[in-house]
């Protein structure tokens, strides 16, 4: 395993606590230029940075940090939105931030080149699909720093991987889903079958299996086969109709807890749950209640990935000339991933289940429970 650095996200991810686009954009400041959900995510990221005791160093040089987003768009209410919020949270008089959105896979390399040509000090690729183009650019432009969300290092001094052990937090989500289901059936689906997606699904199904083992139950998990490493996928991160079709099919199979791992497509699943009243949803990447409050009534929890804080940190490191190619790995132990609060569902989840989740989290963090 490659050496990884650790960045604590403070206490951003508690378990079981209730709490009452154009293609190019530079430093939007509210109003018509930024969705409310993204502003709220930015506030959450800023709060996490405050926990870390982060302050911006004085600098005469202006640092330009740029994000190359995938086709999900900046307002996907998931990892793109989280990445942009993280960048915004460290923007100030000495740091400017901007992003480019890809309309298709063919835009990845040209968008990265455009950002380099514009003088970006660091280019952050958001999403596994852009990893190859970013690694190639790192070799071609050694004077520019690069970082990739959901990808590993490229073996060059100017390229950093930002990775997350989301199978750990998804294991907790699977255990929670198995304890909550009334029908004995839960489900998950993904956008596309690659590690940044399947890690969530694999952890979720294994969490269900763990619940069955310790409770001597037989909850069924649809959508992912941990042996075959394959399951139910939309095929992209933009087909709302297909995501809706999958969600309805799961309900027909009696699934009453659904975990979509497909970025903004989770909205189709949540909207269906609100309409059908047959299921609840586990959101992915960001806190769904904050990112997509219109779905609050059907979101039992969210599996969090500390994209925003890791993006903010790598920008700060570039600004202070402390950039390192050592990959970052967010885990339960360093709070780089975790579960969101239960919000409206807090009273519906037993104290025993909450305590079990805490014990499981500690065991995973300590290494005594292997996933």
Q: Which residues does each PLM region occupy?
A:
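Intrinsic disorder/low-complexity segments enriched in polar/small residues
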Residues: 4, 36-37, 362
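Short, Lys/Arg-enriched N-terminal segments with co-localized hydrophobic residues
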Residues: 6, 12-34
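N-terminal low-complexity, Pro/Thr-rich disordered segments
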Residues: 29, 57-60
């Amino acid at each position: 395993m490659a050496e990884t650095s650790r960045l604590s996200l403070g206490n951003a991810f508690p378990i079981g606590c209730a709490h009452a686009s154009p293609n190019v954009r530079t430093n939007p400041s509210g109003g018509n230029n930024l969705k409310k959900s993204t502003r709220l995510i930015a506030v959450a990221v800023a709060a996490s940075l405050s926990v870390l005791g982060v302050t911006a160093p004085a600098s005469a040089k202006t640092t330009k940090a740029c994000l190359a987003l995938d086709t999900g768009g900046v307002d996907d209410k998931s990892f793109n939105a989280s990445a942009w919020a993280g960048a915004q949270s460290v923007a100030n008089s000495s740091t400017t931030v901007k992003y480019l959105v890809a309309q298709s896979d063919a835009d990845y390399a040209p968008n990265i080149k455009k950002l380099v040509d514009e003088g970006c000090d660091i280019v952050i690729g958001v999403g596994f699909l852009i990893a190859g183009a970013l690694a190639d650019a790192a070799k071609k432009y050694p004077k520019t720093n690069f970082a990739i969300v959901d990808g590993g290092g490229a073996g060059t001094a100017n390229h950093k991987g930002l990775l997350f052990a989301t199978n750990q937090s998804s294991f907790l989500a699977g255990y929670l889903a198995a304890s909550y289901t009334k029908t004995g059936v839960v489900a998950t689906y993904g956008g596309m079958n690659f590690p940044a997606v399947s890690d969530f699904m694999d952890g979720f199904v294994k969490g269900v299996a763990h619940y069955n083992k310790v409770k001597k139950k037989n909850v069924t998990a649809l959508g992912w086969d941990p042996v075959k490493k394959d399951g139910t996928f939309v095929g992209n991160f933009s087909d709302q109709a297909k995501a809706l079709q999958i969600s309805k099919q799961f309900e027909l199979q009696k699934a009453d807890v659904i975990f979509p791992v497909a970025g903004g497509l989770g909205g189709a699943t949540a909207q269906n749950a609100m309409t059908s009243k047959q299921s609840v949803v586990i959101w992915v990447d960001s806190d769904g209640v904050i990112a997509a409050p219109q779905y609050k009534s059907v979101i039992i929890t969210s599996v969090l990935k500390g994209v925003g804080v890791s993006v903010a940190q790598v920008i700060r490191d570039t600004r202070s000339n402390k950039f390192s190619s050592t990959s970052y790995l967010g885990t339960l132990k360093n709070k780089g991933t975790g579960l969101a609060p239960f919000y409206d569902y807090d009273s519906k989840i037993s104290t025993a289940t909450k305590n079990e989740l805490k014990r499981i989290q500690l065991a995973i963090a300590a290494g005594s429970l292997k996933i």
